[in-house]
Regions:
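Hydrophobic anchor residue at the start of the ABC signature
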Residues: 163
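The feature captures the beta-strand-to-loop junction immediately N-terminal to the Walker
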Residues: 33-38
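Helix-to-loop junction immediately C-terminal to a conserved catalytic motif
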Residues: 51
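Conserved ABC transporter NBD signature motif
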Residues: 59-67, 78-79
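Conserved ABC ATPase "signature" region
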Residues: 113-148
Length: 168
């Protein structure tokens, strides 16, 4: 079976500091995979390398059979990899549904022009994102919160909203 995500001898240095040293791992479809370690062990740095925020000092990252080493985060996201961050980064004065719909921005074709003038493309994209966002909220158990402002949610639910947005 082909791996969803694979790291081969990935290292990342900050000057002389070895934050990540020769990490090799393979995640198959359906796997539940955890990365554990003490503070400062390099876990976040490793995820930053995998998602394109940092370029590895050495090694290779492969996503769905395709090398993504050194690609910028937006290109990696377009290939289907998403992530959340340690600090919650929701739009606090938008609803849960609106926060999840924002996660679809890389999949829609609407431009600022089409949104401004409410073109056919805009309405098609709006319909698609609305339907899919509601589906995701239902799948992660957040549908009852869809009209709630993110700012009014407890921390744990806010984290789930971030995960739902990453799934978009």
């Amino acid at each position: 079976m082909a791996a969803i995500l694979e790291a081969r001898d990935v290292s990342h240095y900050f000057g002389g500091l070895k934050a990540v040293e020769k990490v090799t791992m393979r995640i198959e479809q359906g796997d539940i995979f955890g990365v554990i370690g003490p503070n400062g062990a390099g876990k976040t740095t490793f995820f930053n390398v995998c998602s394109g925020i940092y370029r590895p000092t050495s090694g290779e990252i492969i996503f769905r059979g395709e090398p993504i080493t050194g690609l910028p985060p937006e290109k990696i996201a377009r290939k289907g990899m998403a992530r959340t961050f340690q600090n919650i980064q929701l739009f606090k004065f938008m609803t849960v549904l609106e926060n999840v719909k924002i996660g679809f921005h890389i999949r829609t074709k609407s431009t600022m022009f089409s949104a401004l003038f409410r073109t056919k493309q805009y309405w098609q994209d709006e319909s698609f994102t609305q339907e899919k966002a509601i589906e995701i909220l239902d799948n992660v158990g957040l549908l009852t919160y869809k009209d709630t402002l993110a700012n009014n949610l407890p921390y744990g639910i806010q984290r789930k909203v971030e995960i739902a947005r990453a799934l978009a």
